[in-house]
Amino acid sequence: MKLIILEHYSQASEWAAKYIRNRIIQFNPGPDKYFTMGLPTGSTPLGCYQKLIEYYKNGDLSFKYVKTFNMDEYVGLPREHPESYHSFMWNNFFKHIDIHPENTHILDGNAADLQAECDAFEEKIRAAGGIELFVGGIGPDGHVAFNEPGSSLVSRTRVKTLAMDTILANARFFDGDLAKVPTMALTVGVGTVMDAREVMILITGAHKAFALYKAIEEGVNHMWTVSAFQQHPRTVFVCDEDATLELKVKTVKYFKGLMLVHNKLVDPLYSIKEKEIQKSQAAKKPYSD
């Protein structure tokens, strides 16, 4: 397990974006080899998405051969509704990059058979060869996607009734009117995320410090679903200083001492422009015995 600690939200977002960029480029995706990602919504990943858009616009990164699977979606909210996660992803990320619409997968909260939709989502992930990198965020109570406290740590994609705390927290997105807030959602399970070959969890802000403490310093507990990733062979937690306020001083000191090593994951920072130049130069080399 890696814990990456940066001073500010912007730095944590940039580190995460650099890591994603390097993972995609080093994977060397193509028509017969897609890089498959799991993606979150919410305010935490916005800075990371903005950096990834910047890399694409600068010609350093392409999403042409990337497939994405989103974590969750509200039940009963039209996909064109401004607060649907479909709208969130297209407005904040997908429409700004070169990803093909057919390669983006978001659960349909208006499907006639919701459980069948969840089962089909799991099958699409399997058909894509599994998820290479699942990026996630958490809530202050440590929930991942809509896997709230008490969720099974081996759960799969399913229909979930939302806790009142979640409904109250989400009311700010619906003019403060509880009657407008969806009470159910479709969500990937903790087990679905655990199946990914690598997991990266973004945690920023003092309001999530206790959840990070539970994830790093205490044991695995279904009341804090983020703690499950202690048992994943490749987990990267990326956080800012504010999120570490509940950690022991020696814990913070230990992981900060590893930053020289961990920064080698993003430095050098690769670019598809460099790869294209290398290919061009290789093609121009004269034949020799």
Swiss-Prot record:
E.C. designation(s): 3.5.99.6
GO biological process: carbohydrate metabolic process; generation of precursor metabolites and energy; glucosamine catabolic process; N-acetylglucosamine catabolic process; N-acetylneuraminate catabolic process; UDP-N-acetylglucosamine biosynthetic process
Enzyme class label: hydrolase
Protein's cellular compartments: Cytoplasm
Active site: D72, D141, H143, E148
Gene3D superfamilies, per the entry: 3.40.50.1360
Pfam family, one: Glucosamine_iso
Biological role: Catalyzes the reversible conversion of alpha-D-glucosamine 6-phosphate (GlcN-6P) into beta-D-fructose 6-phosphate (Fru-6P) and ammonium ion, a regulatory reaction step in de novo uridine diphosphate-N-acetyl-alpha-D-glucosamine (UDP-GlcNAc) biosynthesis via hexosamine pathway. Deamination is coupled to aldo-keto isomerization mediating the metabolic flux from UDP-GlcNAc toward Fru-6P. At high ammonium level can drive amination and isomerization of Fru-6P toward hexosamines and UDP-GlcNAc synthesis.
Similarity comment: family membership: Belongs to the glucosamine/galactosamine-6-phosphate isomerase family.
Name of the protein in question: Glucosamine-6-phosphate deaminase 1
Organism for this UniProt entry: Mesocricetus auratus
